[in-house]
Regions:
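Charged, gly/pro-rich active-site loop segments
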Residues: 1-15, 86-161
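ATP/adenylate-binding site constellation spanning eukaryotic-like Ser/Thr protein kinases
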Residues: 29, 74, 130
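Short, conserved active-site entrance elements at the starts or edges of catalytic domains
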Residues: 7-36
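Short acidic (Asp/Glu) patches
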Residues: 62, 73-81, 106-117
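Short beta-strand segments
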Residues: 27-61, 69, 77-81, 90
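A generic structural signal for nonpolar/aromatic side chains embedded in well-ordered alpha-helices
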Residues: 24, 69, 110-112
Length: 161
């Protein structure tokens, strides 16, 4: 697997990256899926940030989602669909690995300066390595369109009737 951060994805497909970032920017809270100790899935709410070419996941100290990611870094992140059934710009989700940032004081400082967490001295910060980005939307009221990006591959688009 190629290591791929947000900047690498945005360089590979700027249009899809802008749409995905817009969807995540439409609402504050999104859904993060992690794996529990026994391997079963856990879903929790989360705020995300796109800063300095990275997708960041910040968490309260010793939150169960942070402990899950320390044990198994795989995650899935689903954008908040918002109210109703409109879902302008479609449904988007991101899969990847979350890498805790505990040895890069400059990255933590820049995140704190931008985000201003409640306690800047006590939180978990993870950068992400993307394994896939998926957008699903309806086109012309006729097609369900699924766009899938994976590192090192072009975007694959499937239209279903």
């Amino acid at each position: 697997m190629d290591r791929s951060n947000w900047a690498a994805f945005a360089a590979a497909d700027p249009g899809l990256a802008a749409t995905v970032e817009k969807r995540f920017g439409a609402f504050t809270h999104h859904v993060l899926a992690t794996l529990r100790k026994d391997g079963s899935p856990r879903t929790t709410g989360l705020e995300v940030r796109f800063l300095h070419g990275e997708l960041w996941l910040g968490m309260m100290p010793n939150s169960v989602k942070a402990l899950d990611l320390r044990r198994d870094p795989r995650f899935a992140l689903q954008a908040n669909p918002g109210p109703g059934t409109d879902m302008a710009d479609g449904d988007v989700r991101i899969g990847g690995r979350a890498i805790e940032v505990d040895d890069d004081a400059e990255a933590v400082r820049r995140y704190v300066d931008e985000v201003n967490p409640p306690d800047p001295s006590a939180f978990h910060l993870f950068r992400t390595e993307l394994t896939e980005v998926v957008r699903t939307y309806v086109e012309d009221d006729a097609y369900l369109v699924v766009q899938v990006w994976k590192p090192g591959e072009p975007v694959r688009t499937v239209r279903r009737t």
